[in-house]
């Protein structure tokens, strides 16, 4: 007998992106997991972020953004696994998502970033992107993050020591 699946139980494809950061792994981990209300500006987005909880092993935050057809809300629980990985589970009114992030040192002092995620849309007419379009959009965002991170790293290295 074929097992029935509901719309609620379906997940889409697994998405993947890989980016290199011109910073050491410890700096990349600290930078990537330092969730702040200012993160939207790095993405060129307009959502508002509220940090609900922050401990050495977990960050919980909520994002809220107005759209043409109402509010987009999500709550993300990020489990930190220092020194090089973290896991995120997000629930929202339009989609749920699970993601795994892994950093690996590269021989030249740089860091490789690997992101794998799955999302489950909850709204049938939500903006549909192909797998390639979604991965390309995410890659662009992480390249912007990489540029900001590398600038922050250079700035931190120029600070005078006392």
Go through the PLM ranges and name each one.
Residues 1-56:
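Hydrophobic ligand-binding cavity/cleft-lining segments
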Residues 10-16, 58, 96, 108-112:
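A general secondary-structure signal for short beta-strands and their flanking turns/coil
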Residues 15-21, 101, 115-117:
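A structural signal for short, well-ordered beta-strand segments
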Residues 28-32, 38, 61, 77, ...:
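Hydrophobic pocket/interface hotspot
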Residues 52, 59-65:
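Short, well-structured hydrophobic secondary-structure segments
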Residues 66-112, 118-120:
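Hydrophobic-ligand binding "helix-grip"
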Residues 118-162:
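A conserved amphipathic terminal alpha-helix motif
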